[in-house]
């Protein structure tokens, strides 16, 4: 009775029909190992080899495969709130965290390749990047102010040239009218001379 109790406390609890074969194989392993140990201990002829029946490994392998396949099916769709579900959730969280760290590391390496004067330390790379961005923004602001100033100067110059062009155009028109008046006066004077010459003759 004591022997049976020592074996029974090693047996796994039954949680479903699929574990009957697993329990059988587990019991056979215990009996076989226990029998082998006692036979060797009480063998009066140590020099003689004791032949023991081979364990049914095929049955054990098939049982293990059945249990493994059953376990895989359970792991594919674990019940919400179960230990497997929390384990899968933790593994998923760890995978997401690992990818996030890899993305951050790749981004810092890319910054180190772009920003001049960076060291290998990640903290120094980030500080140098912040300084570089500030300097770029300052340069951008200076370029914007310079562009606005140049635009104002260009607009003022264009306005001055437009006024000068209008003044020159007005002067040209007055000069042209004066020329036309002088031409008319010259033609009128020629006509008077012709009349006087004809009258004298």
Curated annotation (Swiss-Prot):
Mention any one GO cellular component term assigned to this protein in its UniProt record: nucleus
Q: Looking at the record, which segments are called Disordered?
A: 53-74
Q: Which domain of life is it from?
A: Eukaryota
Major place of residence: nucleus
Spell out the InterPro entries in the cross-references. Answer: bHLH_dom (IPR011598), bHLHzip_scCBP1-like (IPR047206), HLH_DNA-bd_sf (IPR036638)
Task: Please give a single GO biological process term from the UniProt record.
Answer: regulation of transcription by RNA polymerase II
Q: Which UniProt keywords apply?
A: DNA-binding, Nucleus
Q: bHLH domain: from which residue to which, for each copy?
A: 88-136
Q: Where is the composition biased (Polar residues)?
A: 59-74
MF term (GO), any: DNA-binding transcription factor activity
Where does this one sit in the cell?
Answer: Nucleus
Among its keywords, does the record have Nucleus? yes
Cysteine pairings via disulfide bonds: none
Keyword Transmembrane helix found:
no
UniProt name for this protein: Uncharacterized bHLH domain-containing protein C3F10.12c
Organism whose genome encodes this protein: Schizosaccharomyces pombe (strain 972 / ATCC 24843)
